[in-house]
């Protein structure tokens, strides 16, 4: 593990930009950007358009290391180039922003009040390739909808099992057990989740590091102790369906937690904007998310 990169992720101010919408969520992301489904006729054209959108964000002046520590990429984005360089290399070498790779293959059906991750075939090969591509860490998401202890334990078991495999490959896994913000039992889910995360950290091999990506908790500073744990590099928050302003306000109340927003980051950006308008909007967004992340 590169000490310079690790120190940057652990100690510097800023947030993580999530640019990892995958196949299923790409049409939605493009539509929000003002690109209708009629603008493309196949998957290749769709991914070309979304890469153009991501390139526009990443090459934006405001998308810089003063505000942003890392960026989470979809596998296709990792395989592509920005200004003639592989995306991950462009991020680190030109911007000093750490690249992360989304590794999960989506969610399984609801069972015991949760959605586990679908199996990830060829994970070892993907991790080996990610290391070759100079990726720093990974991200994988499960969802908790009900305060079911059995289900929540299964989510954290799966996340840590894969997280250990990822950490052993030389990457820093972002463990993301999202609590659905619409859950009527949200606070209860979070209490159970916190206990499970504590238990799993106790048995995490001492030479391995993880990160947590969590819904902004109902009880302020619920996860603060994790921000001080020697094996937790960083605790980041997902926006989870809140508007950007609401997510920023709620995040600012949680010490040590930084943002990792995707939809909230792209809010207000449109394909039709001039570069000046696009960059001004991006700068304003980044400033707001950054401010909420340094409290």
UniProtKB/Swiss-Prot annotation:
Lyase is among the record's keywords: yes
EC number(s) stated in the UniProt entry for this protein: 4.1.2.13
Swiss-Prot/TrEMBL GO biological process terms: glycolytic process
Biological pathway: Carbohydrate degradation; glycolysis; D-glyceraldehyde 3-phosphate and glycerone phosphate from D-glucose: step 4/4
Gene Ontology MF terms in the entry: fructose-bisphosphate aldolase activity
Record bears the keyword Lyase: yes
UniProt keyword list: Glycolysis, Lyase, Schiff base
Pfam families the UniProt entry points to: Glycolytic
Residue intervals passing through the bilayer: none
Reactions it catalyzes: beta-D-fructose 1,6-bisphosphate = D-glyceraldehyde 3-phosphate + dihydroxyacetone phosphate
Root EC class: lyase
Catalytic residues, chain numbering: 176, 213
NCBIfam families the record matches: PRK05377.1
Stated family: Belongs to the class I fructose-bisphosphate aldolase family.
HAMAP family membership: FBP_aldolase_1
Full protein name: Fructose-bisphosphate aldolase class 1
Organism listed in the record: Treponema denticola (strain ATCC 35405 / DSM 14222 / CIP 103919 / JCM 8153 / KCTC 15104)
């Amino acid at each position: 593990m590169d000490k310079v990169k690790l120190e940057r992720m652990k100690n510097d101010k800023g947030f993580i930009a999530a640019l990892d919408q995958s196949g299923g969520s790409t049409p939605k992301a493009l539509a929000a950007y003002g690109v209708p489904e009629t603008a493309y006729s196949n998957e290749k054209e769709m991914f070309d358009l979304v890469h153009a959108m991501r390139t526009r964000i990443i090459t934006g002046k405001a998308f810089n290391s003063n505000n942003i520590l890392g960026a989470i990429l979809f596998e296709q984005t990792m395989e592509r180039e920005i200004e003639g360089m592989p995306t991950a290399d462009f991020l680190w070498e030109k911007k000093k922003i750490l690249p992360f790779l989304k590794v999960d293959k989506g969610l399984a059906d609801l069972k015991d009040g949760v959605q586990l991750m679908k199996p990830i075939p060829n994970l070892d090969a993907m991790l080996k390739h990610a290391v070759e591509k100079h990726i720093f860490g990974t991200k994988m998401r499960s969802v908790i909808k009900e305060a079911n202890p059995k289900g929540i334990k299964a989510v954290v078991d799966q996340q840590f099992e894969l997280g250990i495999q990822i950490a052993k490959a030389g990457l820093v896994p972002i463990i993301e057990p999202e609590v659905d913000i619409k859950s009527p039992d949200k606070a209860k889910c979070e209490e159970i989740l916190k206990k499970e995360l504590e238990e799993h950290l106790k048995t995490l091999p001492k030479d391995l590091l993880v990160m947590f990506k969590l819904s902004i908790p109902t009880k302020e500073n619920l996860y603060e102790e994790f921000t001080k744990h020697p094996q937790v590099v960083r605790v980041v928050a997902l926006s989870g369906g809140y508007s950007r302003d609401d997510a920023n306000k709620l995040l600012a109340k949680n010490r040590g937690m930084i943002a990792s927003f995707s939809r909230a980051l792209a809010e207000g950006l449109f394909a039709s904007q001039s570069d000046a308008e696009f960059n001004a909007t991006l700068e304003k967004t980044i400033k707001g998310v950054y401010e909420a992340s340094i409290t």
